[in-house]
Amino acid sequence: MEHRGISQGDHHRVLHEIKLDRQALIDFYHMFPKETHLPWNEFKLKYNSNNPYRRNLTDKFKMVYAPAYEGKELIDYPIIQELISKFNFRNPLIVTDVQILTYDAGFKFKTHIDAEVNWSMFIPLIPKDGGEPLVYHQGNNHRDPGPEIYRVHYSIEHPTLTT
C-alpha cells in the first residue's frame, strides 16, 4: 500500500493543519555552507562523545552542524522557533531534537529499524518531490524486519509525523 498527499496510517499522519513556508525553509537551509554538513557519525560525536559508530550510515548521509556557521544551534534560529511554536510539545525540545539531514547523490537508506527514535517529524525540502518514501516493515528484528507493510511519500506542504 502507498500513501501520498494528505494521508494517515498506522505509523504516520500528515499534519495538514500545519502549512509550511517551504521556500523560507529552503533559503534557511542554503544559508549553511557545505562545510557545516558533517557525516552522520561525526555529527553525533559533537553531542555525545560515546556515540557508537554506525557503519551503515556512510559519509553520504550528513547533518547540518549549525554551530560551525554562526555558533548557534538550529533550534536558536527564529525560523525554527516559529515552526516549533505551531506545536504543543509535552516536553520542551532540546538542541538535538531539531536536525537538518542531507544526502549526497547516490545515498540510499538500507532497510533498518530506528531503535533510538520514538517518533519523527519530517519536512522534506529538496528534492521537490519529497524524495524517497519511508517504508514500514512488519517485524522488529534488526536482521530480518519482515515483509513491507506500506510506504509513505512525504508531503512537501505539510509535516509528516511518523512512529
Regions found by a protein language model. Give the residues of each.
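Non-heme Fe(II)/2-oxoglutarate
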Residues: 1-91
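Catalytic core of non-heme Fe(II) oxygenases with the double-stranded beta-helix
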Residues: 92-163
